Amino acid sequence: WYFFAIFVGVIVGLMFEPLPGGAIGFIGVTLVAVLSPWVLYSPAELAKPGFKSFNAALTWALSGFSNTTVWLIFAAFMFALGYEKTGLGKRIALMLVKAMGKRTLTLGYAVAIADTVLAPFTPSNTARSAGTVYPVIRNLPGLYESKPNDPSARRIGSYIMWVAIATTCVTSSLFLTGLAPNLLAVELVAKTAKISFTWMDWFKAFAPVGILLLVLIPLVTYWLYPPEVKQGDEVPKWAAGELGKMGGFSSREILLAILVMVALALWIFGGDFINATTAAMVVIS
């Protein structure tokens, strides 16, 4: 019950964020380690000859930092942060919107492709969809006087937003590193069933269904929830203007793009000679 109380306290802290999430988690682990005789171990374990609860508690507290899954999640988040800080994620989305935004249907595919390109290196659908894709596409409905919570949303806004939401649900499952819980699930399967998955194993297993869904989402949405605006020049013009403001590719964007391609190549082709976590850490280093 003491452990449960600390666990609930950490969850509440993460919800209300009086401190950064990392600090709250660290405090929770530290409390469990310090109070281990009452929180972590049973009287029978404490009574064992030579058992030192505080040494064992320290080993428990630090065990997570030796977990390869944790480090792979960390590495993927570093890539996601790089997309945001360099502006490469925004540039990719704008380039796709500029190239495919003249027709509403192809605009839907541009949104889907943008999310798919970012997914392997963003293990959070919130960070990917809401943090990178949404800041770009939220500007598009207004170009056609399509407003949220208004009948005019049917002009184009509802279509774009629904495609974005549905797409990120698929890309989160398509790639092992597309969502942090995927990595935790692989770790759980490895421990319980003694079955290991590589990055490529996961992708090949879901690709037949995932790719089909990515192809169908913009099209089926276009049929079932048709936008009133079918085509126009406003979106490509707006995207071209935004790209003009960003200027040419910076050296940081080019470097990040190269590192991303190297990491992806190692994950796809290097499974037989290098661990996915090692590959990610090498690239980040």
Stretches with model-predicted labels:
Residues 15-18, 85, 102, 196:
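Helix-loop interface residues and adjacent transmembrane-helix termini in multi-pass membrane transporters
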Residues 85, 125-129, 144-247, 255:
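Juxtamembrane and boundary regions of transmembrane helices in multi-pass small-molecule transporters
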Residues 22-149:
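Membrane-embedded alpha-helical segments and adjacent helix-loop junctions characteristic
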Residues 18-28, 88-89, 93, 97-99, ...:
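Alpha-helical transmembrane segments of integral membrane proteins, especially early/N-terminal helices
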Residues 1-2, 66-70, 96-113, 147-162, ...:
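Membrane-interfacial loop-to-helix junctions in multi-pass transporters
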Residues 1-72, 191-192, 201-285:
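Hydrophobic transmembrane alpha-helices of multi-pass small-molecule transporters
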Residues 12-19, 114-124, 166-176, 265-270:
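Transmembrane alpha-helix interface/packing and boundary motifs in multi-pass membrane proteins
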